[in-house]
Regions:
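Juxtamembrane intracellular "pre-TM" segments in multi-pass secondary transporters
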Residues: 1-18
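Extracytoplasmic gate region of multi-pass secondary transporters
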Residues: 13-70, 154
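Interfacial helix-cap and linker-helix signal at transmembrane-aqueous boundaries
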Residues: 42-43, 73-74, 158-166
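Loop-to-transmembrane helix entry/capping segments in MFS-fold secondary transporters
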Residues: 49-50, 133-143
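Structural signature of the two symmetry-related core transmembrane helices
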Residues: 81-96
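Paired small-residue
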Residues: 103-111
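Intracellular juxtamembrane helix-capping segments at the cytosolic ends
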Residues: 118-131
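Multi-pass alpha-helical transporter architecture, strongest
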Residues: 173-199
Length: 199
């Protein structure tokens, strides 16, 4: 809990869970940047322009449908477990995108659609496990501010990867790797909570 005057950045900086939450948010946010390259990934896989453009729609469908159940799933399974499972679904989407087949990239885009809600839905629920009330508002504002600054270069880098390699495989791979790191951070956060309860 923060001091009476409220939670300060200095006190947050002394909490290891702050860095877990910040980096988990950052990794989830960076993974969502792949969304803007989905049409190009479809063209790379040999889809005609009309079908490739549909990949963004498929991702949006995955995005909207996942938002409907993530909150409920968190109530049933807990925020940590739901966060972990959601990342795994996104990773399956990444693998399907990497396969580069017309059918696989369409299915991959649908499953990838769960990625944006990782930062917009699951990260706030994750933070609420560590901070309550006004402390949560303060902590989450710092998490989002620093997390966004940390990964903002990936907006440019994801495009540069294609310029360097002539393929979106590296972009998809780096996005997937960032989510693997996010999964490890979420797991570590869950472990920290369990240890705290036992203490």
């Amino acid at each position: 809990a923060g001091p009476e005057k409220g939670l300060s950045l200095a006190s947050l900086a002394k909490q290891p869970v702050f860095y877990l939450a910040l980096l988990a948010y950052a990794g989830a946010l960076a993974g969502s940047y792949l969304n803007m390259f989905l049409t190009s990934c479809g063209l790379d896989a040999g889809l005609p322009m009309t079908a490739a453009a549909m990949m963004t729609t498929m991702a949006l469908l995955g995005n909207m449908s996942s938002k409907l159940f993530l909150g409920k799933a968190s109530d049933v399974f807990g925020a940590v477990r739901t966060f972990e499972l959601s990342i795994l679904v996104s990773e399956i989407g990444h693998v399907l995108l990497l396969l580069g087949l017309p059918a696989s990239v369409m299915a991959g885009a649908l499953l990838y659609g769960i990625t944006p809600p990782l930062s917009s839905v699951m990260a706030p629920l994750f933070c609420k496990l560590f901070w309550k009330g006004e402390d949560y508002g303060t902590a989450y504002s710092y998490v989002t501010m620093f997390g966004t600054l940390l990964v903002s270069p990936f907006n440019t880098w994801f495009g540069k990867f294609y310029d360097l390699t002539g393929s979106y495989d590296l972009t998809i791979g780096v996005s997937g790797l960032l989510l693997v790191i996010t999964l490890a951070l979420v797991w570590a956060g869950g472990r920290s909570l369990r240890a705290e309860k036992k203490a």
